[in-house]
């Protein structure tokens, strides 16, 4: 299979060195039998620098560029933990990532273009590579009827259609550094390309494997 992961930067940044090694080992296990791409988010590092940039009057486009640099730093950190299982040089384009996959069974990258979140980059990469599965490993354990951090009555949706996901996510305002289970652009790409997608809690490293063997407790998205 070809599997593309969108790994939230907040998930990765919360790990100490031992935690990073656990994620690296899980990804190596998955890559034994699959071609794996991992797109890493910027997390708190990106939000901190984007916040400071806004404070000094930076445009949203410049804030996006700063966020991309943060994602690439996080990607480089994960690549270092993978210790040769993925290229140390972080690809900066989809073509670079696909070229690297000719040599490596695992490729780790960050953001690509201003205006695209990590989820959107991962969805586009899944589209480019005709991926079998897109896994969005984030800080929530699926898609809910509303924000579970704000609404105690929010209910997790175990399965949903791509069109329903796109409709739900289109109501979320998208700015540099914004957070949502799946961003609106990614949802549109998932819908148009019929990409099988799973949203899982990436804070549990075991969910990276469970997402592909069907034993996860997240949200499955199908066309």
UniProtKB/Swiss-Prot annotation:
Annotated residues that bind ATP are located at 9-10, 43, 47, 138, 144, 147
Location(s) in or outside the cell: Cytoplasm
User: GO biological process annotations for this chain's record?
Assistant: 'de novo' CTP biosynthetic process; UDP biosynthetic process
**What modulates its activity?**
Inhibited by UTP.
UniProt keyword annotation of Cytoplasm present: yes
Q: Name one GO cellular component term.
A: cytoplasm
Pfam hit, one: AA_kinase
Give the first-level EC class, as a single word: transferase
Please write the reaction equations for the catalytic activity of this protein.
UMP + ATP = UDP + ADP
GO-annotated molecular function: ATP binding; UMP kinase activity
Q: Any signal peptide, and if so, which residues?
A: none
Q: In which pathway does it act?
A: Pyrimidine metabolism; CTP biosynthesis via de novo pathway; UDP from UMP (UMPK route): step 1/1
InterPro entries on file: AceGlu_kinase-like_sf, Asp/Glu/Uridylate_kinase, Uridylate_kinase, Uridylate_kinase_arch/spir
Please report which protein family the annotation says this sequence is part of. Belongs to the UMP kinase family.
PANTHER family, A to Z: URIDYLATE KINASE, URIDYLATE KINASE PUMPKIN, CHLOROPLASTIC
How it assembles, according to the record, is: Homohexamer.
* Function of the molecule: Catalyzes the reversible phosphorylation of UMP to UDP.
Q: What is this protein called?
A: Uridylate kinase
What is the source species? Answer: Methanothrix thermoacetophila (strain DSM 6194 / JCM 14653 / NBRC 101360 / PT)
């Amino acid at each position: 299979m070809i599997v593309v992961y969108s790994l939230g930067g907040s998930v990765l940044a919360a790990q100490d060195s031992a935690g990073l090694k656990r994620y690296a080992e899980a990804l190596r296990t998955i890559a034994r039998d699959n071609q794996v791409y991992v797109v890493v988010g910027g997390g708190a590092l990106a939000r901190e620098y984007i916040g400071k940039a806004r404070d000094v009057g930076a445009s949203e486009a410049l804030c996006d560029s700063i966020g991309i640099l943060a994602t690439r730093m996080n990607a480089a950190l994960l690549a270092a933990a993978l210790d040769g299982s993925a290229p140390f040089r972080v690809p900066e384009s989809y073509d670079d990532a696909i070229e690297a996959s000719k040599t490596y069974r695992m490729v780790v990258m960050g953001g690509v273009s201003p205006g695209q979140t990590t989820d959107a980059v991962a969805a586009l990469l899944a589209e480019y590579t005709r991926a079998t599965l897109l896994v969005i490993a984030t800080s929530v354990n699926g898609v809910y009827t509303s924000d579970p951090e704000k609404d105690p009555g929010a209910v997790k949706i175990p399965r949903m259609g791509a069109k329903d996901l796109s409709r739900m996510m289109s109501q979320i305002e998208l700015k540099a550094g914004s957070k949502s289970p799946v961003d609106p652009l990614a949802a549109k790409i998932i819908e148009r390309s019929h990409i099988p997608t799973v949203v899982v809690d990436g804070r549990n490293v075991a969910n990276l494997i469970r997402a592909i063997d069907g034993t996860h407790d997240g949200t499955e998205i199908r066309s």
